Amino acid sequence: MIKRKLATFMLTLILVMTGVSMIKVISYAQEESAGSSTNPKERVTEYKYSAESDPQNGVVLKVEWNEPKLGENTTFHVSADGGSDRYLFRMDAPSYSNPDEYSFESVADPSRGAWIQYTDECESHDFEFTMTASGVYNFRFYVMDKTLGVYYMRVSTNIQVSDRAYPSVGDIVNAAVKKCSKETDGSDYEKALWLHDWLLKQLDYDHSLKWSSAESALTRKLGTCQAYESAYSKLLTAAGITNAETRDTYDGHTWNAMKLDGKWYQVDCTWDDTKDNYYNFDQTHLYFGLTDELMALAHNGHDQIYTASGYGTRSTSLADNYFVRNGDATKWARAYAERIQKNLNAGKTKFEVSTDNASYPPSISGIQNGIIAYALNQMTWKAGSKKVACGRNIHQAFFYCKIYGHSKARENSICSKWRACEFRK
């Protein structure tokens, strides 16, 4: 689907725009521009490529650069003419698109740090940026000349680069999905799990909160939650798995919803990417295949999102939860089996069983116990001819079980109530 360009480092589509930018900005720029300069003696005096704006109050903004090389810094010399020579310059967070697609995603978070900061007053300024994937990068530069009343004047340029040593994001995704197809049985669950595990091996969380795209995740090996979500979404889409972004605007976090075997599930690759092993189970899959209810235990703001009308990826099943599928949920449930059966044998019709993980934080214990409660309700209990349902208590660290008759309506009522409960210590 993605055509590889034969020409290396081809430069195309130079777009020049002026006026107030309507493009939202992200933050991480000039840490890469730490070596930028405003000293004319340190600048290159001749450049191969350039783009400039139309005049505004007599001021013209110009950007110049030489042949870019993937994996190396490209210097962008930004200057202005016709004004006071007391200019303030800014570089926006670059955006990236696969070749021939022209569907751009900000490489970095445009709302933070140097991306939103103008330089001190100067005649010109050098910005630097390293391109890391074959494709098209969009660069935007701004100037202010307050003396002449020029604000937010912009020049924008697209630069297409190609190098087989630096594949496009699309090529990286397609190669991963091709390998996934060879190493799994082709089911939605197996593909989603394989791609989840593959992605976690590719990158680390960017604690500087700068890199926030699939490009940064797959080529810079760093990213925020937005990078994890974006990269995983591209992988799932390429594998034929329906997915959507779940954005917790209350907590400032994002993750994926995916549709496996016709049902929606929540998965948080960012929180699964951990080296911790504090809780005696595989934490790298704790947030794979959760219900909305359980995910809200980790991300409290999600409780207000998934309960709102119009929410489109409602997730209520644990059938394709990682621990349910690999058998750990059943093992955990069996740890409570003797205690539950002992109460049943004693003729109790309603009782509580303390959990073994009460010391864990709610985002850990609550999710684990929700999965255990699901497994408990898949088990068969000896209680004469009566049914037994088990749930987790919303406020205390225990499971509770209740015996009831054969009424299907009553059974559904109880199970629905308990599955809707949250678990908190």
Residue ranges and their predicted role:
Residues A133-F139:
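Exposed beta-strand face motif in extracellular beta-rich ectodomains
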